[in-house]
Amino acid sequence: MRVLILGASYGTVFGTKCLMAGHDVTLVCRAPTAKLINEHGTHVQIRLEGHDQHRDFWSNDLAGRLDAMTPETVDAGSYDLAVLAMQEPQYANHSIATLLAMLAEAYVPCLSLMNMPPLPFLKRIPAIDMARVEAAYASPWVWQRFNPDLVSHCSPDPQAMRPPGQKANVLLVGLATNFKAAAFGAADANVLLSELSESIDTVRAIGQEVPVKLRRHRSIFAPFAKWSMLMAGNYRCVTTDAPISIHDAVYDAQDLAREVYDVTGEIVLRLGGTCDDLVPFEKYAKAALCLNKPPSVARAIDEGAPIVERVDRLIQGLGRQVGVTHGEIDRIVDLVDHRIARNSARAA
């Protein structure tokens, strides 16, 4: 299988698992990063169960073939599957938007690893009034050409970061959970998704399973389990001052974190999900014990970004559609609005 991955940062984790399973991968990234990867490959560190140290996985040692390209050099129609691993605002870039249009026109199935679900995926949910959610997106227009049945979405649960001082081709997986993918609306695309999932399942290193699997779920709502985590943790790491860790966001006010977590889950239920689609707060809180760094959205805001993924605003808007609101969600949205407006003013 030929897999195209837009975004060489987070996408490298998914790409490494594809390479282990014998699939060929192209990472789409900036020219300097593409040059680095084409010359030296990628290096992902994953800790196997029962081991204290992370194990190194170099792309040059894996079964599949890896290359990296800039978006304008990609032949979109030559791939079996595209994986969307950039943050939502990045798709407004002209060369990326053009590549998206080419993927849509070539009817290439697209699997999102974004925190922000692509708009065509949301179109598959009858309860959502699309006109009322587009304002949460930085570039809603880039999704107009897609067939919704060929767009699916993952809960991007694995946590990865670039170790301090390392180059752009190195990633360390800090929380090795699974990608939970909703089924596509198209049967042929689901065959591809199942084949990819099953092939990744067979991967072994020193006789052991390698963490970070791809799990296909029948429910379209399965990836939305991540929403509660984002609202109770990630977006509450944004403060009026320096960002805090997910651990601190959850444990410094655990009762409030649980409230936000449960209210966000209620929004998913009212959209049509079931309790089986959600993750209990206790399981999330246990995972948060080891999440001792600020998440990317909080770091980006602190570093002056004038635009970030607005999952907080999307969830607030969907909650209002289904009659579920909470003061802490409103506070989060207002604070993020304020911080990015201040960043925009400073950048002007």
What do the PLM-derived regions correspond to, one by one?
Residues 77, 111-227:
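Rossmann-fold dinucleotide-binding core
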Residues 29-80, 100:
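Conserved N-terminal Rossmann-fold NAD(P) cofactor-binding segment
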Residues 1-48, 119-120:
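NAD(P)+-binding Rossmann beta1-loop-alpha1 motif at the extreme N-terminus of oxidoreductases
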Residues 73-118:
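Rossmann-fold NAD(P) dinucleotide-binding segment
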Residues 15, 34, 96-101, 316:
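Short amphipathic alpha-helical segments and helix-helix/interface helices
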Residues 19-20, 104, 269, 320:
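Anion (oxyanion) recognition and catalysis
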Residues 166-170, 176-177, 198-205, 209-234, ...:
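NAD(P)-dependent Rossmann-like dehydrogenase/reductase catalytic/cofactor-binding core
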Residues 92-99, 189-199, 260-261:
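Well-ordered, non-membrane alpha-helical segments in soluble/globular domains
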